[in-house]
Amino acid sequence: MKYELQKTDGRARRGRLVFERGVVETPAFMPVGTYGTVKGMTPEEVKETGAQILLGNTFHLWLRPGQEIMKLHGDLHDFMQWHGPILTDSGGFQVFSLGAMRKIKEEGVHFKNPINGDSVFLSPEKSMEIQYDLGSDIVMIFDECTPYPADWDYAKRSMEMSLRWAARSRQRFDELNNKNALFGIIQGGVYEDLRDVSVKGLVDIGFDGYAVGGLAVGEPKEDMHRILEHVCPQIPEDKPRYLMGVGKPEDLVEGVRRGIDMFDCVMPTRNARNGHLFVTDGVVKIRNAKHKDDTATLDEHCDCYTCRHYSRAYLHHLDRCNEILGARLNTIHNLRYYQRLMAGLRQAIEEGKLEHFVEDFYGRIGKPVPPLNV
């Protein structure tokens, strides 16, 4: 993987990630394919929305169908028939989400398999081996996602263990002679001094890119913005920056303003299945009765398959009838909305007009522009 920084506008960056499997224009949004599928979508449909890279979930794919089934097909690309780049998370966040079902120790995490109750162990080394078998174009180190709220002492211990796990991840990745990219994950909760230690430790180890983890876990938006403003300038300029698990359209805009290059989130797909659709002027809740006889298209500014063919009334009808097609059409639209948003941000950075874009974006959805303290 090679990262090329092409243009900046303030802290915002316009670049590209070059892989053997294709080019990813940044800032980029990665649809989430947890189980080897973006829910309800064929790979061709996902590509048509403008997506150039997907996210796969190491934890879930390891538990089901497992490494051996994957290797029978070649790797995850062959298994799911997506031949563009794939980033896989390490499983750290999913283990963190298990709560009482897991025990975190220095060697790794012991937990109960949520599918069948078996005792399972996941370590930095095992995560690197699984992601190697998946053929991930971007491998994420195994870390502990520091919860929110966490006091300074807990966040410090968690961050320090994540640094030790980062070094172990790096070592096992190199032992496997993996030629793909390995990203470090910056932890430290909402504490700037801990984030400083994490960034320096990871840069000293050396990675192909750096993710900001432990945000979008319940902290106030002001804290997310503050941490990004503090951390991003410390990340080497020639390496991509990835904000994990984010987020709402406004979060993507604010991340880009602060120097983030990559995002992922289940929001566009999950919300689509619940009739919550993103449009240029905000949100349409297609389940609401007012759309029953609305012959208008979902978003007159959108060029997706759904908006080119169907009315709000039809989408409302499908949702009320629990038709699978409704969830699919909604997903196509939401994914395209996110990709159009990213394309707009990229163009604005190229033209040196990012803040004009930001003002227009917030004006359309009727919200004030958050302050930028950089």
From Swiss-Prot:
Reactions this protein catalyses: 7-aminomethyl-7-carbaguanine + guanosine(34) in tRNA = 7-aminomethyl-7-carbaguanosine(34) in tRNA + guanine
Pathway(s): tRNA modification; tRNA-queuosine biosynthesis
GO terms under cellular component: cytoplasm; cytosol
Listed GO MF terms: metal ion binding; tRNA-guanosine(34) queuine transglycosylase activity
Coiled coil regions in record: none
This protein's UniProt keywords: Glycosyltransferase, Metal-binding, Queuosine biosynthesis, Transferase, tRNA processing, Zinc
UniProt: Zn(2+) binding residues: 302, 304, 307, 333
Transmembrane segments: none
InterPro entries from the UniProt entry: ArchSynthase1/Queuine_TRR, TGT, TGT-like_sf, tRNA_ribo_trans-like
Keyword check for Zinc: yes
Pfam families, per database record: TGT (PF01702)
Active site: 89 (proton acceptor), 264 (nucleophile)
Needed co-factor(s): Zn(2+)
UniProt enzyme class: transferase
A GO BP annotation: tRNA wobble guanine modification
Binding sites annotated in the UniProt record for substrate: 89-93, 143, 187, 214
Presence of the UniProt keyword Nucleotide-binding in the record: no
Record region (RNA binding): 245-251, 269-273
Note describing how the cofactor binds: Binds 1 zinc ion per subunit.
Function recorded in the entry: Catalyzes the base-exchange of a guanine (G) residue with the queuine precursor 7-aminomethyl-7-deazaguanine (PreQ1) at position 34 (anticodon wobble position) in tRNAs with GU(N) anticodons (tRNA-Asp, -Asn, -His and -Tyr). Catalysis occurs through a double-displacement mechanism. The nucleophile active site attacks the C1' of nucleotide 34 to detach the guanine base from the RNA, forming a covalent enzyme-RNA intermediate. The proton acceptor active site deprotonates the incoming PreQ1, allowing a nucleophilic attack on the C1' of the ribose to form the product.
Family per record: Belongs to the queuine tRNA-ribosyltransferase family.
Subunit structure: Homodimer. Within each dimer, one monomer is responsible for RNA recognition and catalysis, while the other monomer binds to the replacement base PreQ1.
Name under which the protein is recorded: Queuine tRNA-ribosyltransferase
GN (gene name): tgt
